[in-house]
C-alpha cells in the first residue's frame, strides 16, 4: 500500500517561512537521499519542508520526513529498484502526478541523492524536470560513489549526472572519493557515509538559510536566484574557523577544500555568506571577504551576506560559498583527476 500525502504529512511545524509565502522543499530521493534528509532533520535546517521519495516501502517507512512519496507502486511493488536506474526513472514517471501535487506552490527545491544506485539515479532527473517545468528554482546536490563501490555504480552515476544536469538550474556534485581524502585513514565505513550525509546537510542548510534566516547584511531570494537560475554545474565550499584567526581560517578552508576540483576563478557568479556570533569584528569580515575576492575573477558577480547566529560558538566563524556559471561545466562534473580511475574501470567512451 502506498502513502497518502495528506495522511502522511506530519503535524509538526518546521518553521516554513511565511514572509511572501516563500516555500522551500528538500527532496531526498532513494536510500542515500532518504538517509541524508533524516540526518538533516536530526541536526536541523530552518525554514524548509522535507520530502522523502523512494520505491522501497520499508526504507520509506523509516523516514522522518514531513511528506513521504512512494513511487512506482505498480512497477516495483514497494520492493525497490534493484540498483537499476531505468526502473527508478519509470517509477518516477508512473508517479508524476504525486510529485506534481507535492511541488505545488513551491519556490525552490533541493534534490539530494546518492548517485550510482537505482532510485536516486533514475528518479532524480525526472523529479527535476517536473520541478523546472513548474517554474521552480531547482538545485540538485548529489554524491558520487566511492571507488570501492565498483565500476558499475560509477558508470551509473556518470550517466545519471549527464541526465540530471539537463533538468536542473544548478547541479552540485560531491565526490565521495574527494571527501575520503579529508578523513583519517582509520575512519570507519559508517562514519565515512555519515560524513557524506553531513556534507549534503551543510550544503542544503548553507544555501537555504541564506534566504530563510534574516541576515545583518541580507541576501534575499532574488539574489540567490540571480546566481543559481540556469547556472549549470556549480562548486560548493564550506569552511569553519576557530580562535584568533577564525575568519581567515574559515575562508581559506572554504576555498581550499579537497571537494573543490576546479578553479573557482573561472566562475562568473559567486554568492558567499559568513555566519558568526555577534562579536565578529569589521576587520574579520573584511579579511574573509578579501580571501574570497582574491580567489575570484575580477569580472565575477559576487554577492555577500552576513548572518548573526547565537548557536555559533563565540570563538567560531563559518563561511560558505557557491560558485556558478563556468565556461566548461564538464571539467567540474567529470574532472581530469577522475579520468584515470574511470579508465581503470573500463569506462572508456563515457566522457
Curated annotation (Swiss-Prot):
Belongs to the FtsZ family. This is Cell division protein FtsZ. Gene3D superfamilies: Tubulin/FtsZ, C-terminal domain (3.30.1330.20), Tubulin/FtsZ, GTPase domain (3.40.50.1440). Its main location: cytoplasm. It holds the Pfam family FtsZ_C. SMART domains: Tubulin, Tubulin_C. It is found in: Cytoplasm. Essential cell division protein that forms a contractile ring structure (Z ring) at the future cell division site. The regulation of the ring assembly controls the timing and the location of cell division. One of the functions of the FtsZ ring is to recruit other cell division proteins to the septum to produce a new cell wall between the dividing cells. Binds GTP and shows GTPase activity. The lineage of its organism: Bacteria, Thermotogati, Thermotogota, Thermotogae, Thermotogales. Keywords: Cell cycle, Cell division, Cytoplasm, GTP-binding, Nucleotide-binding, Septation. Homodimer. Polymerizes to form a dynamic ring structure in a strictly GTP-dependent manner. Interacts directly with several other division proteins. Interacts with FtsA. GO terms for molecular function: GTP binding; GTPase activity. GO terms for cellular component: cell division site; cytoplasm. GTP binds at residues 31-35, 118-120, 149, 153, 197. The gene is ftsZ. GO terms for biological process: cell division; division septum assembly; FtsZ-dependent cytokinesis; protein polymerization. The keyword GTP-binding applies. InterPro entries: Cell_div_FtsZ (IPR000158), Cell_div_FtsZ_CS (IPR020805), FtsZ/CetZ (IPR045061), FtsZ_C (IPR024757), Tub_FtsZ_C (IPR008280), Tubulin/FtsZ-like_C (IPR037103), Tubulin/FtsZ_2-layer-sand-dom (IPR018316), Tubulin/FtsZ_GTPase_sf (IPR036525).
